[in-house]
From Swiss-Prot:
The gene is ttr. It is found in: Secreted. One of its GO terms (cellular component) is protein-containing complex. It comes from the Eukaryota. This is Transthyretin. SUPFAM superfamilies: Transthyretin (synonym: prealbumin). The modification Sulfocysteine is found at C34. Belongs to the transthyretin family. Residues 1-19 form the signal peptide. L-thyroxine binds at K39, E78, S141. Its main location: secreted. InterPro entries: Thyroxine_BS, Transthyretin/HIU_hydrolase, Transthyretin/HIU_hydrolase_d, Transthyretin/HIU_hydrolase_sf, Transthyretin_CS. One of its GO terms (molecular function) is hormone activity.
Amino acid sequence: MASFKSFLLLALLAIVSEAAPPGHASHGEADSKCPLMVKVLDAVRGIPAANLLVNVFRQTESGKWEQITSGKTTELGEIHNLTTDEQFTEGVYKIEFATKAFWGKLGLSPFHEYVDVVFTANDAGHRHYTIAVLLTPYSFSSTAIVSEPHDDL
């Protein structure tokens, strides 16, 4: 069990690291205007989770969820520029990962229909958020890197 936890920790550290392939800007470089991005790793195959549908919602004052954007992860398991600084205001957000469809395309029958990550954003001033998710058909783990916006160099 301890080795599995160590694996999860190492996988999450790898997924949120600033390392990027040549020609690919990591968060904070060319994407300095990117207030919200996601990184997803397929822990079964040990590769980025490409072509995973992601929907982003903001909670309204009445408590309902309003979809604000959506996208699909790249071959690197990432989505940059999900929203803008102006649109990403203080509030409660939900990122919904369409995991059943993702695993179904691989011939697997997962437990979760969707995986949701719900969080409060910008309550202590404007920040940039990188949400990292590690997926298997029966479990998930998430972490966040919250940072100050970077000035253009």
